[in-house]
Structure formats: structure tokens, C-alpha cells
């Protein structure tokens, strides 16, 4: 009897030890996965670089490209990022990418530093802001696109030896674009905050551009695609009110100047309840920044400020499945917004949850949703669940970040990655030849696009790993930029 009881006790203790060990190993694996994903998410931006590559370039299968950008307008427009799987520089999504990279550095700076990625993250940000500075040569002039979308998309070529037109397009007082100017102002203002602790002079340059761009956007209202018509078929803007609020919120945070807060409180509306936060809809971003001010008690939390906060928290409640109009979830648990590149919306929503979790923690506050309360820890856990899904905890057992894990997309829709590196084979790739030899090639891409996030699975958790499946298989900078911050937050 005694022996049996002792044996049972030993068996129980052994079982507990095994469970604890397995759980510990699982946590270690997840933690390592987060570290790998964070590192590779920043490598992705190196693969998207346009222009003269620096000596410390780590993605060595890429080469210099588009070294004459801007020459048609007698201006240097080299640098910046290609937006997705093509060879285009679209200023509207590029500016949003920049703002989200900056926000990641601002809110998760200490985490990025702890994970030894702050330097890489700031370098990714500066590659974008250096270009945006070039693109804004005069207060009321902003270059918003390089390349022609239609001709670029008709060809499947490497950026290093592409022969498609590199036309420079701009907005100015006679050809306005409040949305483009407003988003670029937001990017410059946010980046100025990120760089201020390290390079005050550079931060001051950025804030000067941000102020000029915001003034330009207000003084000369208009949709940018009416001036840069070529952009309309690719990144058309649905309005510019959100960009102006977003820019004002960032300028207020960067300068603490009352005139920007006045703009926000005197605006005709706060954007109302939103269903997404993305490159064409920044209302949620502005609402969250204003809610932060209210939580910090830096402004009165009634009237217009209270409305911003209410709208921000309504979006969060819906993402947490505790709202009145909840975001759809796939059977596997992914927040599902829209079919085309759904992960761009998942990563921005996850960023909002991660950032707001920090705001609530600092304020010792919670959110009262229609279907229950949310604590700061709840928000971070939801964000972590989305990261885990994206990195492989899903019905497909697939990581949707290229190069992370063993089962990840092998054929993302991406010209540079799908064609042999110019460093290995300098034979020119022609417009149609690229389609014949590389686009239609059933083999995996010859270059691994480390850290890229594809568009992701459909509403039933199904993903098709084919280059032709661009709605699911094309990565974009707007998807990865917020994910940098989320990865740092959930680590």
C-alpha cells in the first residue's frame, strides 16, 4: 500500500515534470519564433529597397536599381521602397508604411532595443524618410509616384535591369493631393519623434517638412489621384479627411502645439465607427492617438475628445469579439476583414491592440465593451493570438511569413524574388521573357524573400501558394510595417 502510493506520487511528479518541460520547450520555441520573425521582418525592408544599396546591405541577392529616378524632372528621387511585388514607388502607401514603422519605433522602442533590433528598425525607417525628404523639394510640391503602374505590371522584370518607364509624378498647388500630403506629413511627424532621441537635427528637418506638408494639404484640398491619375487604378484614395486628422494628431504629439489639437477638436467629425485601419483609412489611427491623450489626462476627456476615444474603443471591442459589430474570424481564429491581402488589416488591428494595451496599463484603465470588459492583458493576448496564427498556429500549419519555420509560402508574387539574382546571372530579363521563364515557372522562387508577409488565407483558412494568386500571395510593405511593432510587443 505504502509502496503503491509512493510509486503513484513519483509517477504523478514525473508526469508534471514532463508537462512543465514540454510547456517550457513550447514557450521557448514560440519565443525563438518571435525573435526570428522580428529579425526577418526588418530584412524584408532591405529586399524592398530601391536605389543605391549601402555597403552593409544584408540581403545580398538584391542589387542597385532605379538609379536615374527623378531625372525626367531634374531631381534626385532615388531610394525609397518598392511597394509590393512590383517595381513601383507609390508615395501614398509608402508614406503609410513610414508612419507605421515610426509608430512601431515610438511605442515599442524599449522592446526593440531589448531584442537588439532598434538599430535595424531605425535604419528601415530612415531609408523611407530620406526618400520622402527628397520627394518634398518645395513647401507646395511633393512627388508621389515614380514609374507607370500599367506598363510596370505588364512586365515581369527584376528591378536591377527593368526597362519600363520611370516617370516622376507630383502634386502641387495647381494639382493638389491633400490625402498624399497629409499622410506624408504624418509620416514625417511620427518619424521625427522616433529619431529625436538619437539625432535631434534630423528630427528637426523632418518636423519642418511635416509642418509644410500639413499646411499644403489644408490650403489646397483635393484627392491626389485626380492629379496623379496613374495612381488611381492601384492606390486610389477614398477621401482626405482621415489623413488630415492623422497628420494633425502626429504633429500635435511631435510638437505639443495647440493649433494641431484645435484642428482635431474643431473638425466636423471624428470618422465615426470604422471597420478597418489601413493605407486608405487612418481614422482609427487618429482616434487611438486622441484616446491616448485622454487616458493620460493631458486633455479633457469630454466632448470631441471623448468621441475619438469612444470610436477607438469601439474598433477594439469589435476586434476582441465583444462589440456590437464584431470583426469576422476564420474557423482557425484569424481576424478576417477583406479578401485581398487580408493580413494588412490583421497586422494593423493587432498593432492597435498592442499599443492600446500599453496605454491602458499606464493609465490603470480598462475598456467597457457592449459584451464585457477588456483589460490591457486581454488586448495583448488577442494580438499574440494573431501573431501565433500568422507564424504557423493555424489549420494549414503554415507560417505566412516567408522564411520563418519550414512550411511557408515558396512562391510569393514578387518580381525580384522570383527571378534569378542579377549577382548570379547578369543576362537581361525581358518584359515578356520574365513571364515565360520565371512567372510561369512551377518551381519555388530562387530568392527567399525573408520576412515578407503574404496576403494570407481566405475566410476558410485556405491558402494557395501560387504566383498567379496575387490577392493571397503578394507581400506588401504596408502589411509588414505594423507587424514589426506587434512582434516586439508580444515577444
UniProtKB/Swiss-Prot annotation:
It is found in: Secreted. It catalyses: Endohydrolysis of (1->4)-beta-D-glucosidic linkages in cellulose, lichenin and cereal beta-D-glucans. Disulfide bonds: none annotated. Glycans are attached at residue 6. Belongs to the glycosyl hydrolase 9 (cellulase E) family. One of its GO terms (biological process) is cell wall organization. It is an enzyme of class 3 (hydrolase). It comes from Arabidopsis thaliana (Mouse-ear cress). GO terms for molecular function: cellulase activity. Residues 1-31 form the signal peptide. It comes from the Eukaryota. This is Endoglucanase 12. InterPro entries: 6-hairpin_glycosidase_sf, 6hp_glycosidase-like_sf, Glyco_hydro_9, Glyco_hydro_9_His_AS. Its EC number is 3.2.1.4. Keywords: Carbohydrate metabolism, Cell wall biogenesis/degradation, Cellulose degradation, Glycoprotein, Glycosidase, Hydrolase, Polysaccharide degradation, Secreted, Signal. The active site is at residues 86, 413, 465, 474. One of its GO terms (cellular component) is extracellular region.
